[in-house]
């Protein structure tokens, strides 16, 4: 599997914060971008995982374009981003954190709860289901 970003550009008004970044990552590779503050490293990753929509450029998983896929669709395909900061809402429980993400999908409330239950079981989180993030 190959994840590829081609000529990614991100503009906020007149300010171009990412200027034509291209990157290719093969399955199993670990990638980090080095550069000074404000160079567009985080924004580039955000575009690839779907947190930020690129102004232009394309993102592919293998040969399938995923530029317009929502973040949860990319996650279903195995694309994720581990932030430098804590990635859970610390005052919410494990279950509430999972439900928070599932609320971004097109699933009904009942389907969200079923999916949450499945994920908790799949990752063996039953014993910490009601624990707050800051207590894990």
Q: Language-model segments: which ranges?
A:
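Short coil-to-beta microelement around the adenine-binding A-loop and adjacent beta1/P-loop entry
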Residues: 15-16, 73
């Amino acid at each position: 599997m190959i994840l590829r970003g081609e000529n990614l550009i991100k503009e906020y008004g007149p300010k171009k914060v990412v200027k034509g970044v291209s990157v290719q990552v093969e399955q199993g590779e670990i990638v980090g971008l080095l550069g000074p503050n404000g160079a567009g490293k985080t924004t580039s990753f955000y575009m690839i995982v779907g947190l930020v929509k690129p102004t232009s450029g394309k993102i592919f998983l293998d040969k399938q374009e995923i530029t317009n896929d929502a973040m949860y669709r990319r996650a279903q395909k195995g694309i994720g981003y581990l932030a430098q900061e804590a990635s859970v809402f610390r005052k919410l429980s494990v279950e509430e954190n999972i439900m928070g993400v599932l609320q971004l999908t097109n699933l009904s409330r009942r389907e969200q709860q079923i999916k949450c239950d499945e994920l908790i079981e799949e990752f063996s989180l039953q014993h910490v289901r009601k624990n707050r993030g800051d207590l894990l």
